[in-house]
A protein has these predicted regions:
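Short acidic-glycine-tyrosine-enriched beta hairpin
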Residues: 61-76
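Histidine-centered metal-chelating micro-motifs
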Residues: 36-37, 56, 72, 76-81
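A short, N-terminal "cap"/entry segment at the start of jelly-roll beta-barrel domains
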Residues: 1-23, 103
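Structural motif
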Residues: 54-56, 63, 79, 89
Length: 103
């Protein structure tokens, strides 16, 4: 995945990694209404901030609704997925770097 380039992540979901640091990185993600980010986990801590829209997250079996201006912390190794309830845009911040997304 290229830095500062949009990439199709899943149907109705595109993402762009902004210039990463040494230990932290930020990724912008845009969802069409009804689009989903499949459930997964990773050893990285994640902070997600909703720039626009409304999304329903499942985090370790609990539903968390996120609207514009709200954020959520996703702990290391937590199983999580998301569904956009309307067109949405968010920022994900990861530490340490998500090497799996950078390579």
């Amino acid at each position: 995945m290229g830095i500062n380039q949009w990439e199709q992540a899943e149907p109705g979901v595109k993402r762009k990694i902004h210039s990463p640091g040494n230990e932290v990185m930020m990724m912008e993600v845009v969802f069409e209404e009804g689009a989903e980010g499949s459930s997964h986990s990773h050893p990285h801590e994640q902070l997600t901030y909703c720039l626009e829209g409304k999304l329903a997250f499942q985090i370790d079996g609990k539903e968390v609704l996120l609207e514009q201006g709200q954020s959520v912390h996703i702990p290391s190794n937590a199983v999580h997925g998301v569904k956009a309830l309307m067109p949405s845009r968010l920022l994900d911040v990861f530490t340490p770097l998500r090497e799996d997304l950078l390579n």
